[in-house]
Amino acid sequence: MAKKSLNESSPVARFEQSLEELEQLVQKMEVGEMSLEQSLTAYERGIGLYRDCQQALEQAELRVRLVTDPARPEQAEAFEPPSLDGG
């Protein structure tokens, strides 16, 4: 049986590319040398990239749940990342 390949247009397949572009956009905006119009355009693009990344993470979490317990994906425990505040 052939292995399934990720659809190149899926958010999961584009996650790293979107995250890298978002990081570059933030760096450019932090420099503060953009015009107001450029800043607004960059902000709008950043929001779109953020949403793409969030959707990719949600889809990846669902895939993990399905692999963990394919018979009962609705009862699989949600992944809770460790707290960054040390608590």
Curated annotation (Swiss-Prot):
Keywords: Cytoplasm, Exonuclease, Hydrolase, Nuclease. SUPFAM superfamilies: XseB-like. The keyword Hydrolase applies. It is found in: Cytoplasm. The keyword Nuclease applies. One of its GO terms (biological process) is DNA catabolic process. It catalyses: Exonucleolytic cleavage in either 5'- to 3'- or 3'- to 5'-direction to yield nucleoside 5'-phosphates. Its EC number is 3.1.11.6. It is an enzyme of class 3 (hydrolase). One of its GO terms (cellular component) is exodeoxyribonuclease VII complex. Bidirectionally degrades single-stranded DNA into large acid-insoluble oligonucleotides, which are then degraded further into small acid-soluble oligonucleotides. NCBIfam families: PRK00977.1-4, xseB. Heterooligomer composed of large and small subunits. Belongs to the XseB family. This is Exodeoxyribonuclease 7 small subunit.
